[in-house]
């Protein structure tokens, strides 16, 4: 019995020695040990580079007005943010930030303060362009004209909420192409869950590279049931903002073409009467009296097939197309009415002025 026990112990020792030689990792195995690492070697996830690229170009904007109850002293009425677009000193902000201002003050992040000149503003997009005359260089926002914002892109909202000083909030692009959020229904917004608070209006919405994606413009204050929703903010896409800026710099206002209809797009359908051609277009549901469309003979329930030789697929895109046509131009508009195709000549007018 004792001999068998010794034999078993000896075999166990031999097997153990073989395993230690074959698998050296077993020698230091300690099930109670905690993995050690040096945190100084790790790089934390950060958007600091994007902030350093974009933030210097985002300014504080102060709307000052005369207070007749205080011996006509200038006082701050509203505050917001703005974005320096180029070295000439042009700044984009929201129109509602500078409405009725007697004086506009712009404060840069480097401590410089300027009185700004209002170049022009546009009610339909709620955009305004300011200009400052600065000696020395100005920080400008990075713009990549080829960059297309996508749902899920990380974005940073930069502005001056509640006059706390420059603040950065982070989120994603929640949706693109949001329309119908302003009275004109013509606006095309980016939606984001990055916080956009009072004072952020006119500030920059940038991507993770610090490139301008949009101009922060508004957030939902109340929902239909009276609750204050969180994570719903909007920005004007940078492509539209830069286009409006160029027009304001050139003309001092935005000159838009106007056709004078309201409508909705329809999906392709087969023409009545067994025709094989598929129709797609905009059904006219409103014609402004004495407007260009009415004067050309366009009627309610007409189906617009093309405008100025371009297919009419989206009501918003077609209105944007018309807006780019200079007033006074005569364009062909093809409509279907009672199974007949008509080509009508429409003289474009200037879009009626709004406050």
Curated annotation (Swiss-Prot):
EC top class, as a word: hydrolase
Q: Which residues lie on this side of the membrane: Periplasmic?
A: 28-355
Q: Which GO terms describe its molecular function?
A: identical protein binding; peptidase activity; serine-type endopeptidase activity; serine-type peptidase activity
Residue ranges in the Cytoplasmic topological domain are: 1-4
Asked if the record carries the keyword Repeat, the reply is no
Effect on the protein upon substituting residue 122 to A:
Causes substantial reduction of peptidase activity. Binds activator peptides
Q: What is the effect of changing residue 198 to A?
A: Behaves like wild-type
Q: What does this protein do?
A: A site-1 protease (S1P) that cleaves the peptide bond between 'Val-148' and 'Ser-149' in RseA. Part of a regulated intramembrane proteolysis (RIP) cascade. When heat shock or other environmental stresses disrupt protein folding in the periplasm, DegS senses the accumulation of unassembled outer membrane porins (OMP) and then initiates RseA (anti sigma-E factor) degradation by cleaving its periplasmic domain, making it a substrate for subsequent cleavage by RseP.
Q: Which PANTHER family match?
A: PERIPLASMIC PH-DEPENDENT SERINE ENDOPROTEASE DEGQ, SERINE PROTEASE FAMILY S1C HTRA-RELATED
Domain comment, as recorded: The PDZ domain probably binds peptides ending with C-terminal Tyr-X-Phe sequences, which activates proteolysis. In the absence of OMP peptides the PDZ domain inhibits peptidase activity.
Q: What is this protein called?
A: Serine endoprotease DegS
Q: Which organism is it from?
A: Escherichia coli (strain K12)
The lineage is: Bacteria, Pseudomonadati, Pseudomonadota, Gammaproteobacteria, Enterobacterales
């Amino acid at each position: 019995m004792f001999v068998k026990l010794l034999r078993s112990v000896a075999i166990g020792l031999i097997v153990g020695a073989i395993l230690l030689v074959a698998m050296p990792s077993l020698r230091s195995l300690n099930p109670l040990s905690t993995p050690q690492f040096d945190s100084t070697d790790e790089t934390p996830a950060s958007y600091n580079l994007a902030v350093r690229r974009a933030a210097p170009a985002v300014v504080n904007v102060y709307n000052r007005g005369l207070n007749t109850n205080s011996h006509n002293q200038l006082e701050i009425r509203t505050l917001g943010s703005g974005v320096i677009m180029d070295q000439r000193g042009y700044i984009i902000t929201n129109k509602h930030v500078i409405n009725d201002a007697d004086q506009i003050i712009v404060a840069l992040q480097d401590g410089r303060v300027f009185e700004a000149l209002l170049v022009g503003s546009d009610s339909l997009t709620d955009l305004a362009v300011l200009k400052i005359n600065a000696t020395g260089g100005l920080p400008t926002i990075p713009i990549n004209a080829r960059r297309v914002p996508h749902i899920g892109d990380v974005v940073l909202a930069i502005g001056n909420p509640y006059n706390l000083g420059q603040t950065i909030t982070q989120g994603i692009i929640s949706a693109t192409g949001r329309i119908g959020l302003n009275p004109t229904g013509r606006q095309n917004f980016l939606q984001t869950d990055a916080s956009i608070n009072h004072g952020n209006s006119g500030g920059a919405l940038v991507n993770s590279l610090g490139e301008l994606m949009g101009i922060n413009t508004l957030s939902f204050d109340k929902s239909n049931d009276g609750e204050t929703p969180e994570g719903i903010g909007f920005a004007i896409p940078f492509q539209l903002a830069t286009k409006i800026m160029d027009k304001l710099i050139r003309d001092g206002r935005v000159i838009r073409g106007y056709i004078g209809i309201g409508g909705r797009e329809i999906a392709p359908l087969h023409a009545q009467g067994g025709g094989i051609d598929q129709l797609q277009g905009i059904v006219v549901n409103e014609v402004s009296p004495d407007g260009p469309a009415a004067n050309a003979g366009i009627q309610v329930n007409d189906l617009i097939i093309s405008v100025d030789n371009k297919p009419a697929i989206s009501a918003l895109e077609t209105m944007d197309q018309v807006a780019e046509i200079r007033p006074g131009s005569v364009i062909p508009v093809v409509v279907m009415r009672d199974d007949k195709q008509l080509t009508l000549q429409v003289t474009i007018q200037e879009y009626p002025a709004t406050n």
